Design a protein with these regions (language model features):
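Conserved structural position within tetratricopeptide repeats
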Residues: 57-61, 90-94, 128
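Register position in tetratricopeptide repeats
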Residues: 78, 112, 145-152
Length: 162
């Protein structure tokens, strides 16, 4: 069962199904595109909600699974529930303080919530961790994101809340 946890299920499978439905409804059946898009979005939402439920179940079984909390945060991102996304990433980081991608995603979530100081704080932490790992491609990406965050929150980079 853990094998499928890593490769068998993804929030993107429902998205692919939704795109297939879009193709069938518009191309083959000739329905208006806006109807097909509504069906596609409903499929996407159902898939994202199923992912939230699945990861909550995994967390119930193993509350110390940092990856499950991270994946839960990704599912909340897909639903646009950024406050919940932040909580899930924070829990993942609490369980593994060197979870680099969780720091990166947490920074992006804080940015979506317009919390510049926390966005910068966690992006800096992600940068430090990528430097330790010597992951140069990720370091460049984080530096670009940091530059964007500094530009966006020039006068708001005081002290983060968390």
């Amino acid at each position: 069962n853990r094998f499928f946890y890593f490769i068998g299920h993804s929030i993107f499978h429902p998205l692919v199904k939704g795109l297939f439905v879009l193709l069938v409804l518009t191309g083959i059946l000739g329905l208006p595109e806006k109807w097909a898009l509504a069906v596609d979005f409903q499929t996407y939402l159902k898939g994202a909600q199923a992912e939230v439920s699945r990861h909550k179940e995994i967390i119930r079984e193993d509350p110390l699974d940092a990856i499950a909390y991270f994946e839960l945060g990704m599912a909340y991102l897909a639903l646009g529930r950024h406050e919940d996304e932040v909580e899930a990433y924070l829990e993942a980081i609490k369980l593994n303080h060197k979870y680099t991608v969780a720091h990166y995603n947490l920074s992006m979530a804080y940015d979506l919530l317009k919390d510049g100081p926390n966005a910068i704080k966690h992006m800096l932490r992600a940068q430090d961790l990528y430097i330790q790992k010597r992951n140069h491609a990720r370091i460049r990406n984080v530096k670009r994101q940091l530059n964007l965050l500094y530009l966006k929150y020039q006068d708001k980079t005081k002290t983060p809340k968390n």
